Amino acid sequence: MTITLQQLIALSPLLIVGLTVVVVMLCIAWRRNHFVNATMTVIGLNIALLSLYFVGQVGPTDVTPLLRVDGFSMFYTGLVLLASLATSTFAYPWLQGYPDNRDEFYLLVLIAALGGILLSSANHLASLFIGIELLSLPLFGLVGYAFRLKRSLEASIKYMLLSAAASSFLLFGMALIYAESGDMSFASLGKSLSDHQIHEPLLLAGLGMMIVGLGFKLSLVPFQLWTPDVYQGAPAPVSTFLATAGKIAVFGAVMRLFLYAPVADSESVRIVLSIIAFASIMFGNVMAVSQTNIKRLLGYSSIAHLGYLLVALIAVQSHQLALETVGVYLVGYLFSSLGAFGVVSLMSSPYRGPDADSLFSYRGLFWHKPILSAVMTVMMLSLAGIPMTLGFFGKFYVLAVGVNAELWWLTGAVVLGSAIGLYYYLRVMVSLFLNAPQVLQRDTPNNWALTAGGVVVLISSIVVLFFGLYPQPLISLVQLVQPMM
């Protein structure tokens, strides 16, 4: 098997991030310097983002049976790289006050990004599994990075044990599917499924187990119990990564699997997925209503958002629109989450023990940091799906797909869930404009808008507003990124 230059260029984002991992590792071994390592990380991720332009020039290619690089994988790779960049940027000021080793943080983020890029191009069950593991393993370390805090350590252990259990389900499911169909690439799975083998008990059992494993990674009900605890325990920059890159990469891979292998055509699988979507939307929104901790609230809301996305996934076989929906929704979700978690990270930096994550810390933020609270307001509006923000178009598309595919139950659930969601997002927004407490527990420095993290947060809010008012460029982009069939 010789690899041509074309294939090397197609793999360039993966190779560049891998090279950055090695460089950062050598830098840490040679001399610890927080600034140097952070800069190396950001430069590496930026070069990887720029290399996507050259990947686009090459056109769709298959690199070994495991990876397929096309517009679809480039889109998801770009989203993962943006999320990793934002995470590194938020982490720098947070780590400034951190008493232990700081540099390994960037190393772990880079390795997780590597897993995300691999998942975006996965075309085979083996690369799907390797990608998920590469993404999950560094996250155990990242979630427990503030290990002197009991909560962070607890979150890390919870996540590790549950993740291991979920991975074993996933692997066993893959083994059963392989036993039945004799091949592990997505396309040949599609062939064996289209020959009406889907009623074979082994295939159904394998699919069921894979749904358990993937449902855990996407924190869908009933595999969601870790989500709020881990989001709350993890440092704010890590919660950013978990909520964005961790979900988007896995969803991209699952999306491709469903496109090539018409899994949702089977009545039983579709019913199971519909129940999961319905439960996720309802549970996520209802549980978020009573939260007083902003990271837990965003954790529950991410369960609901993945429920909305699952509606589009169920309809993916029958409708071209579903691909577009997922693209638009994920971009909106990415920037809204980056902004919301970014504000939490800015408030929590530098490290001073627990994060500023109680809603009380944000009370009256408007009176001394008006722009920061405006950013937070925009993010909450976008997550709630209010018109003139990007989140609205995502919701609108999901409803359109649901109606087109005649998923009436789920469309009703999306509407109801959005209504409940409005209540708790408004709660966060209202608390920003109440009277400020006399003694400020946590606050950002006055020049926050000039720091790198502040710039990321401001750019996110501008993107959300710009595409909310004028979504055409984004829609055209998403229509271009169709997977190679």
Curated annotation (Swiss-Prot):
Keywords, ordered alphabetically: Cell inner membrane, Cell membrane, Membrane, NAD, Quinone, Translocase, Transmembrane, Transmembrane helix, Transport, Ubiquinone
Give the principal location in a single coarse category. membrane
User: Is-annotated flag, keyword rRNA processing?
Assistant: no
Look up the record and give one Gene Ontology term from the biological process aspect.
Answer: ATP synthesis coupled electron transport
Q: Name one Pfam family in it.
A: Proton_antipo_M
The top EC class is translocase
Where is the protein situated, by its record's location annotation? Answer: Cell inner membrane
Kindly give the HAMAP family that the UniProt entry links to this protein: NDH1_NuoN_1 (MF_00445)
**Role summary:** NDH-1 shuttles electrons from NADH, via FMN and iron-sulfur (Fe-S) centers, to quinones in the respiratory chain. The immediate electron acceptor for the enzyme in this species is believed to be ubiquinone. Couples the redox reaction to proton translocation (for every two electrons transferred, four hydrogen ions are translocated across the cytoplasmic membrane), and thus conserves the redox energy in a proton gradient.
Q: Could you give the subunit structure recorded for this chain?
A: NDH-1 is composed of 13 different subunits. Subunits NuoA, H, J, K, L, M, N constitute the membrane sector of the complex.
Write the protein's name.
NADH-quinone oxidoreductase subunit N
Origin organism of this chain? Answer: Pectobacterium atrosepticum (strain SCRI 1043 / ATCC BAA-672)
